[in-house]
Amino acid sequence: MTDKSIKELALSVGRPVEKLLEQAREAGLPQRTADDIITTEQQDTLVNYLKKVHGQESGNTGKIALKRKTTSTAKVASTSGKAKTINVEVRKKQVFAKPNPEQIAAEAKARAEAEAKARAEQQAREAAEQKARLQTEQKAKATLDAMRAAHQQDSAAQSAPKAAVVVKKRGGGTVKPAPKPAETLEQKKAREAQTAQLKATEEAARRKAAEEAQQRTLEQMRKMASKYSNDDATATIRVIDDSPLASGLVGQAYEDSFNQEDREIKRGGATTNPRAGKKGGRRGQEEQSFVNHNKRGLKSSQANKHGFEKPVKKQVYDVEIGSSIVVADLAQKMAIKVREVIKTLMKMGELVNQNQTIDQDTAALVVEEMGHNPVLVSDTQAEDNLLEAAEEARGEQTTRPPVVTIMGHVDHGKTSLLDRIRRSKVAAGEAGGITQHIGAYHVETDKGIITFLDTPGHAAFTSMRARGAKATDIVVLVVAADDGVMPQTAEAIDHARAAGTPIIVAINKMDKESADPDRVLNELTTKEIVPEEWGGDVPVAKVSAHTGQGIDELLDLILIQSELMELKASAEGAAQGVVIEARVDKGRGAVTSILVQNGTLNIGDLVLAGSSYGRVRAMSDENGKPIKSAGPSIPVEILGLPEAPMAGDEVLVVNDEKKAREVADARADREREKRIERQSAMRLENIMASMGKKDVPTVNVVLRTDVRGTLEALNAALHELSTDEVKVRVISSGVGAITESDVILAESSEAVLLGFNVRADTAARQKSDQDGIDIRYYSIIYELIDDVKDAMSGKLAPEHRETILGVAQVREVFRSSKFGAAAGCMVMEGVIHRNKPIRVLRDDVVIFQGELESLRRYKDVVDEVRAGMECGLAVKGYNDIKPLDKIEVYDVQMVKRSL
């Protein structure tokens, strides 16, 4: 650093001049203006001050961090029962701080004092132990000598009478020894007791000597370990001492030393000479013993630590069972092989494989049979907990706008009526003039906010109407005044009743001359819809979407009904709602239409819908205008879910991503189990139905639509087209553009590729042109259904239709050498053809069926003979013709059938 002005210094460090002057003043520097010069020493002073202020010490911290990363692999069990290999990465970090010199000197001095004190204490302890050991040995030796002397005296006293005493006789002969006195019982018992006491004393002395030898060995190993731990040059040994390796080595050395001394004591010899050994001296023996048993100690430690311990008794598990469970998953929870579970199920009369699903009761019986404890749990426990937590976080409830669903028959003017209310032109933009998915709108009228759901009226959209009735507060039933109650009108009434939703009848098209509202009311009465003016409880409004007649009256009825229902919701807490519709847009991903029912939905919220979850990245209203939040009864479109959820799925905002993932995975697993169960049931039904029957022609379909609701409706409609003679099978269906994989699938399965309100991408078009696959696009649902019907009709076998061309009566029978029996006939009706099949009838009963061999008029061979004329004919291969028989000529035509 060099001397420079405050302004130059501020420019070099990138800080404002005023801020730098303020910091210099706080550091005690004299500079006050931007042109003042600051020296190098003053710059150092300023830097040290700033470091101190920000919690940093000037100078080096004296710390060093060591990091180590190791990677290994491990095998774990998966849900399928097979082991899979995963990578395990272990990261270690250790920070060493360098102490200052004063601290090092103080620690060295304290360590030296502690070592000197410990050494003095150790020497004093060893001297005391040596003195005590000598005293103990002397006492034991004195006691042992005294007992041996007493024992010898007793033995001498007992053996004295046994000695042979030789006495010379007076006559020069010898005297015989005195006879041996008999040992009494008391003397025998005393001798045995004395012997036992002597043995016990010797055993006690031997045991005490062994304990002292073991203590000496332990002290030797302690000194050796202390030597290694105090050696600065071998600092790494301190780390190793705490490891299982060091424990095994030292422990094995202790054990070997004790065993050696025990063997020497039992042999009656002294302990090993401490000065013996190759290195000489006590230390040499210790180190040699430590080195010799290094390898054996390692093996012993590892064997003791990782040895298998056999279980004392069978493990009993608490097995959690939901409403259904896969056999393989059940076996894994009980830690047994799948075949054991299958055997148990076979004993119970159930024939299943490892991938099949069994119900909760059957699984509980299997678990009890296998000796474990079944725990019955709810599949929706996690979802219920989330809902309860969301309800607890709700604030005060306030009045919310009503949600009104417009329902009725196709072309009765539902969307046009909603257009008049919204003052827009939605119906003109619908393909074919009919609504093909649920439209959600909220309308701000002079009388308040109303949210409308416009449902399709076509027969194929039954599930959509059912969802609309379930998510609504009020149903407006639109009936055309000139058409009356139709099938979808009656279906809408049933949906509204099933959902328990009040109904308001709107008789539309009152501006037409053919309008007959009384007939409509009579037909509604047959469906138990009695209007208020007839003494019932159903409000009726006579409206015209074309002229606007009765619109205000209809809105008043809706708002009055909502006030009577006291609709309330909380605008606070996590949002909760229902999926109205979902689609996949190119470049945007999954677009989900949601009706918020409780709480407030904000951008950035974590949304759980069906088996998918994600954060709201963007949100817009029904007109495509971006918004940041939406309250109760407001329909919105959101982006952020990884895939399009099913229409009708419940939507919930959660705070914990882990819980959202758990609930989504649980829902996906339940859906998978249901699909497996459904497929297995279908396979069984197909096997039973196909027994004894020939193959049925099938029309394969690959279907792609723009929204989920339309996909569901088309799947149901195509499934209902199947008959006993020809089937419709949807190979694949999905939401979004037609892709190359769809074209490949259609080619391999010989399927028809249909797109509803979607188009094929570039790769799919190129592939279809290359392989000659026809892609059909539709925007009106009944046109798609009609084309599939035509394809099914092409698979039907043609019908054989017979037409009687003419009838001739036999008048006389002649014999011919060439033809045999020849009949002279009169043509009664029609025309007799020579090359057409015939039947011979006798008393109006068919007795022969064949063809003519010859047809003549007089002597001429002719091709046909008309009514009222005579002819002669011969039947090929039949000679039993009699008078009054009838010859019937007919023709068989192949007629193409249609559904």
From Swiss-Prot:
CDD domains: IF2_eIF5B (cd01887), IF2_mtIF2_II (cd03702), mtIF2_IVc (cd03692)
Pfam annotation, one family: IF-2
GO molecular function, one term: translation initiation factor activity
Residues where GTP binds: 408-415, 454-458, 508-511
Residues covered by region (G2): 433-437
Region (G5): 544-546
GO CC terms: cytosol
Stretch list, region Disordered: 116-135, 170-189, 262-306
InterPro entries xref list: DNA-bd_dom_put_sf, EF-G-like_DII, IF2_assoc_dom_bac, IF2_II, IF2_N, P-loop_NTPase, Small_GTP-bd, T_Tr_GTP-bd_dom
Domain tr-type G: 399-568
Keyword Signal: no
Localization terms from the record: Cytoplasm
Region ranges (G4): 508-511
Keyword vocabulary terms for this entry: Cytoplasm, GTP-binding, Initiation factor, Nucleotide-binding, Protein biosynthesis
Main location: cytoplasm
Region (G3): 454-457
Region entry G1, spans: 408-415
Protein family: Belongs to the TRAFAC class translation factor GTPase superfamily. Classic translation factor GTPase family. IF-2 subfamily.
Function: One of the essential components for the initiation of protein synthesis. Protects formylmethionyl-tRNA from spontaneous hydrolysis and promotes its binding to the 30S ribosomal subunits. Also involved in the hydrolysis of GTP during the formation of the 70S ribosomal complex.
Protein name (record): Translation initiation factor IF-2
